Amino acid sequence: CVLPAPVTANAYEYAKRLTIREICPKLSGFRADTHEKMGHLDHFKNGWIGENAGDSITFELEGNCIGIQYRKTISRPAVRAQAVLDGDVEHPVLLDGNFDEDWGDCLYIEPVLHHDEKKKHTLEITVLDDECVGTTPFYLMSIIVA
């Protein structure tokens, strides 16, 4: 059986999911979550936590597709953050940790780069200056790069 040639390239063929095990970003207020995962349904482990306004985390990445996997929680209010790719502060991406459903927390993926030129990128995520006291912290699960 011979398959026909692909119509389009598979942009995610070599995707990597980066957690505290695979990458060491620059932490400025964010902290690594080193709690041991207790099974495949124990999702919110091995990521990074931001709690206070101005906390930031910076990644040096290479790829043409980048996604941010974070927790949207039903434990509202939750901290919000913003992502800035390659210093483009005119076009930040909002990462809202508040989940509008009531069935449980959500592993949400926010694409920040899709089918662009493959090159080195800087991704900075910063906790916004919202009222953070008494809120659920921002939980960054992973960065997905292809």
What are these regions (language model features)?
Residues 1-146:
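Conserved catalytic region of serine esterases and O-acyltransferases that act on ester linkages
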